[in-house]
């Protein structure tokens, strides 16, 4: 018996696929139904990791399966290639971002090809290719012309050492994530996209995405944050500050709690706060301290609540005899609503934390059902549930929603404000003070202002002759690139030196894949054919930003006439991460798994260093990461076990939407399965054998094989790859129960049929092994071109049926009967069932109704 050797087999079949160009996408008019499967394209870090293996193996299963079903499959690959890591490499290693990026792409391309994925590499591109980002610049200018792109001064996080703007998530404890410098708040002129113009469409469009995970749709809905509430103004008690004669405008989603107001709060960046700070050093200091804190919403939410009493007071809009203090508070966001709130501590946790700290009143106005208004109080947690309004004059007795409506009506009737819809979503700031990004294609002219670069001068390409020996943006100090002439007046002008947020690059790449040679940004005919993507696969960490921006840009490009679809991804699957135990030595230093030896005695596991024998601490199971060294190199696994074993393991150990824990024992189990599988193919003798279904062993094997088709098909369709693999494992036992050695002609015929089916069913999971097995069986051509097997309904049908039994309409048990059993036989079995007999005790059976192979209804009294 020939031993299966993946080191020889796997490269051989990858070469055969490449030579035959089997994965090249067919023409859009070739008559086959289309199927577009796409995994989120990778950043070219230089090496693939096990997360990549899982992600792309899943996509490959779908692509190969659909191809076998007769679909014209588009399964492309590209590179999300702009971004900070390349600039960091330039600064730290003295290499050019361009060279570093393309070297990494070359390395990762070979690694991904070694995975055996069925990608049409002829459509490959990187977002740093001038051909790609030139097309991006072209549609950007169209959006600029339409007014969807604009500039405005905005408050940003400025790193004074790296001399660049940081996203909120890059500010850690008030310091730059890379430099460690204290971050400053500055106002800079930035470029924005009006994503808020599409807020309603983006929320409403979520209802059409029935093949998206509910949690992702909910995350996007919450991120957009459409809320209906009240916008109104507090009048100042006494003289109003400059420019505030008309009052202090606030927005609230809880007008029902107005009578529970304890104070009014404004953001540290609010114009009133800045006005007061100009004349008050203490307020200046307080605002400066607020700016040192974290700037992400999560950090602001969890930070200690801090405030400063301005000394100003405002009048309650529904009862002017009540006045409220105005505080500057660090938890209020300037870019939500108006940057000012009224605070009702009894019914908002942040307000309550603040009120407790500064000894401000807590006035409950929503009474939970069943509580006594005379004794109800609020403790450590604010009450945010339903109830009846009390302590609120004319609102008393109303439920929350009715009270909201009444409060809005009263405010509107008094011309003090109006009901309003507000969004948490802000316009998308796309300016980045970076070199390694897509240049913004505009020119600044003193005479003409902002002038778009003419389309025939695109792409505006990045200059190669830049240095990274100084902090800041190299484009800003380039001796020639920055300086140009105005396309409008011919005078001296300067190029825009900001580059675009890399989320722009990934917001439309799926559309470019439809026709990578199109002269327009998007080949309309091809895009109309291929879009939307039928199945998109990627990590849930991209649930909000990337997916939201892609949905927005798709709608914007549709409005430009470049696309015909509103939603880019019809189906979305978010796979879990690949995890591994993390290990430390006694000094607290992370240790790689390859340097750890683990022994198990009973339920106790201990670890030591493989080389030194020193004790090792076994830590938690965590996402594989370089920082914790709990990574397993895919190439090492491929070398030791073969690619197919690695592919099989990442899809077999847990449901694909959950994390999978990498273990050596797990991949060894997959390796053993591939060898057992091969042995079944290798042991089958050549020849034509006649079927004989009177042979019970042969018939049982045929039935198992045809049932397997349905199981595996359903598992792929439902993204339950682990269930499909489990069925393949089970079927191997059925094959072993009918060995070739000494078998009858009927069993050999059944085995030949079963192995023919099996080779095609395992092909999406273990494609190299499947090709070798197909060739060993004498299959026509390659298995990659073979059609998906179709089950014989007679053979795939269950021999038995489980029938529920109802007595007078209530389920009282179930019985097993042969499929198609006569009614009288079913009745006899049902009435003899002990559970049924117990429920019929003392009753007379009047009628038994048998619904063939489905249910038994008994009428008795």
Curated annotation (Swiss-Prot):
Its EC number is 6.1.1.4. Gene3D superfamilies: 2.20.28.290, 3.10.20.590, HUPs, Isoleucyl-tRNA Synthetase, Domain 1, Valyl/Leucyl/Isoleucyl-tRNA synthetase, editing domain. It is an enzyme of class 6 (ligase). GO terms for cellular component: cytosol. One of its GO terms (biological process) is leucyl-tRNA aminoacylation. Its main location: cytoplasm. A motif ('KMSKS' region) lies at residues 623-627. ATP binds at residue 626. NCBIfam families: leuS_bact (TIGR00396). This is Leucine--tRNA ligase. It comes from Caulobacter vibrioides (strain NA1000 / CB15N) (Caulobacter crescentus). The gene is leuS.
């Amino acid at each position: 018996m020939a031993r299966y050797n993946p080191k020889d087999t796997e490269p051989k079949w990858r070469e055969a696929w490449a030579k035959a160009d089997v994965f090249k996408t067919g023409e859009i008019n070739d008559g086959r139904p289309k199927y577009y499967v796409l995994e989120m394209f990778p950043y070219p870090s230089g090496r693939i990791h096990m997360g990549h293996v899982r992600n792309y193996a899943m996509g490959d299963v779908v692509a190969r399966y659909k191809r076998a079903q007769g679909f014209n499959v588009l399964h492309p690959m590209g590179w999300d290639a702009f971004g900070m890591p390349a600039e960091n490499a330039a600064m730290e290693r003295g290499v050019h971002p361009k060279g570093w990026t393309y070297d990494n792409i070359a390395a990762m391309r070979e690694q991904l090809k070694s995975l055996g994925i069925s990608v049409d590499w002829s459509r490959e591109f990187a977002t740093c290719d001038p051909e790609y980002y030139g097309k991006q610049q072209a549609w950007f200018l169209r959006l600029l012309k339409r007014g969807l792109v604009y500039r405005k001064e905005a408050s940003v996080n400025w790193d004074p050492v790296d001399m660049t703007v940081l996203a909120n998530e890059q500010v850690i404890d008030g310091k730059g994530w890379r430099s460690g410098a204290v971050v400053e708040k500055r106002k800079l002129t930035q470029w924005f996209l009006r994503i808020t113009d599409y807020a309603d469409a983006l929320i409403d469009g979520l209802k059409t995405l029935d093949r998206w995970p509910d949690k992702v749709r909910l995350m996007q809905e919450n991120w957009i944050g459409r809320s209906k509430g009240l916008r109104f103004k507090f009048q100042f008690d006494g003289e109003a500050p400059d420019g505030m004669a008309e009052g202090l405008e606030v927005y609230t989603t809880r007008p029902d709690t107005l009578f529970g107001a304890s104070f009014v709060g404004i953001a540290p960046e609010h114009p009133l706060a800045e006005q007061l700070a100009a004349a008050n050093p203490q307020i200046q200091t307080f605002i400066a301290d607020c700016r040192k804190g974290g700037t992400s919403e999560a950090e602001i939410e969890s930070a200690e609540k801090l405030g400063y009493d301005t000394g100003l007071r405002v009048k309650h809009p529904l009862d002017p005899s009540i006045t409220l203090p105005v505080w500057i508070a660090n938890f209020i966001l300037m870019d939500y609503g108006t940057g000012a709130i009224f605070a009702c501590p009894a019914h908002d946790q942040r307000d309550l934390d603040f009120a407790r700290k500064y000894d401000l009143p807590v006035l409950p106005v929503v009474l939970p059902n069943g509580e006594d208004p005379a004794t109800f109080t609020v403790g450590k947690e604010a009450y945010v549930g339903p109830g009846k309004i009390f302590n609120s004059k004319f609102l008393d007795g109303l439920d929350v929603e009715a009270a909201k409506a009444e409060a809005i009506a009263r405010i509107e009737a008094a011309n003090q404000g109006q009901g309003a819809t507000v969004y948490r979503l802000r316009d998308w700031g796309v300016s980045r003070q970076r070199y390694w990004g897509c240049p913004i294609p505009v020119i600044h002219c003193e005479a003409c202002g902002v002038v778009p670069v003419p389309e025939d001068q695109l792409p505006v390409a990045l200059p190669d002759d830049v240095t990274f020996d100084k902090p800041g943006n190299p484009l800003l100090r380039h001796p020639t690139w920055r300086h140009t002439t105005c396309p409008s007046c011919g005078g001296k002008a300067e190029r825009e030196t900001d580059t675009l947020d890399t989320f722009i690059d990934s917001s439309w790449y799926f559309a470019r894949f439809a026709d990578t040679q199109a002269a327009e940004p998007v080949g309309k005919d091809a895009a109309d054919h291929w879009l939307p993507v039928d199945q998109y696969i990627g990590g849930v960490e991209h649930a909000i930003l990337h997916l939201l921006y892609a949905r927005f840009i798709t709608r914007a490009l549709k409005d430009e006439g470049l696309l015909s679809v509103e939603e880019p991804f019809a189906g979305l699957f978010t796979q879990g991460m690949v995890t591994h135990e993390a290990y430390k030595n006694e000094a607290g230093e992370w240790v790689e798994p390859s340097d750890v030896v683990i022994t198990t005695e009973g339920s106790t596991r201990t670890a030591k260093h493989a080389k030194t024998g020193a004790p090792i601490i076994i830590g938690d199971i965590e996402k594989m990461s370089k920082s914790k060294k709990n990574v397993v190199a895919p190439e090492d696994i491929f070398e030791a076990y073969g690619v197919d074993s690695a592919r099989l393991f990442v899809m077999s150990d847990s449901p694909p939407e959950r994390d999978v824990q990498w273990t050596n024992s797990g991949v060894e189990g997959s390796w053993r399965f591939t060898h057992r599988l091969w042995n079944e193919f290798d042991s089958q003798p050549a020849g034509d054998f006649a079927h004989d279904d009177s042979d019970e062993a042969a018939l049982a094997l045929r039935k198992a094989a045809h049932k397997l088709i349905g199981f595996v098909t359903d598992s792929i369709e439902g993204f339950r790859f682990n269930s499909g693999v489990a069925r393949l494992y089970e079927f191997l036992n059925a094959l072993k129960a009918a060995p070739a050695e000494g078998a009858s002609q009927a069993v050999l015929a059944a085995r030949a049929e079963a192995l023919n089916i099996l080779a095609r069913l395992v092909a999406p999971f273990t494609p190299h092994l499947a090709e070798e097995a197909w060739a060993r069986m004498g299959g026509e051509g390659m298995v990659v071109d073979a059609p998906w097997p179709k089950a014989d309904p007679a053979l795939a049908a269950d021999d038995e049926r489980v029938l529920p039994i109802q007595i007078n309409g209530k389920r009282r048990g179930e019985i097993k009967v042969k499929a198609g059993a006569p009614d009288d036989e079913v009745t006899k079995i049902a009435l003899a069932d002990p559970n049924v007999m117990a429920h019929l005790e003392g009753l007379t059976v009047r009628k038994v109704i048998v619904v063939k192979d489905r249910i038994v209804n008994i009428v008795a009294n």
